[in-house]
Amino acid sequence: MQTTLDCIPCIVRQALESARFVSVDPALHEQLLRHILALLARMDMTLPPPFVGQIIHRELHRITGVDDPYWEAKERFNHLAAEMLPWLRQMIDRSSDPLFLAARIAIAGNIIDLGINGALSEAEAGRSMEEALTQPLNGDWELLRSEIPQAKRVLYIADNAGEIFFDRLLIERLPLERVTLAVRGRPILNDATREDARCAGLDAMVAVIDNGSDAPGTILADCSTGFVRTFKAADLILAKGQGNFETLSEESAPIFFLFKAKCPVIAAHAGVEQGALVVLRSKLPGKKG
């Protein structure tokens, strides 16, 4: 998915919010924004927005020396999600369609995206999860449901901290011995890393790998050889979040994208209303097995 002109204001906002996560110094905020605006003037608009996000956060790290400005927010949302897990699991267990409800909850958890809304509160996230209990799924859910039992090698690409606890509810309904969970290789925004997978208890359930990258998405050319090997071997890939949709939507692979369409550009690209919960099969599904 290419960057559009409507992406530019969001990129600038994200850069400023990230700078404010690191420091209260207006001079540093201005320094970073001036540099980012100069980069944006020269950027290749055919690239997905996460390419730019990666550059922004590398520059933020270079200027401030702070490796993980979102660590405190990630801890807060992990704690919130952990508290919600028991009653959500109980709802799933009592449901007439546990797999469907688990998927809906996992996708609703994609609201915990501080790249889209750096001011997201725990209360807002909690309300979103409650609303998901009745919100419909748009797109290709029934197709995904039919493919899960046949899959021999499932790759589940996580998106954000906090959200990864809700991913667990869906992963618990998959054939665990066939599942590999992938997280980011290094901190970027509030994206999930190995530490978040460990906090959610997923390392004790399934194989966990990282992609070796610090991009807020999955840029295969920037990922580790091991991750790319696992990606190519998978016959079913569940890719969570908008960043993974932006970076993988042109890849020929058996991918289902699971995300909340928080951004109007992505909602239009996916053919859904903003705020919708989406399951979308790749237009280039590639070969299985």
Which role fits each region the language model picked out?
Residues 153-155, 235-236:
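Structural motif
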Residues 160-180:
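Histidine-anchored nucleotide/phosphate-binding helix
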Residues 148, 171-175, 231, 248:
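Alpha-helix C-terminal capping segments
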Residues 4, 156, 163-164:
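Alpha-helix N-cap/loop-to-helix initiation residues
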Residues 1-151:
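Electropositive, gly/pro-rich neighborhoods at or near active sites that engage anionic ligands
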Residues 183-189, 193-198, 202-289:
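C-terminal functional extensions of proteins
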Residues 152-153, 177-180, 254:
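Residues at the starts of beta-strands that form the adenosine-phosphate
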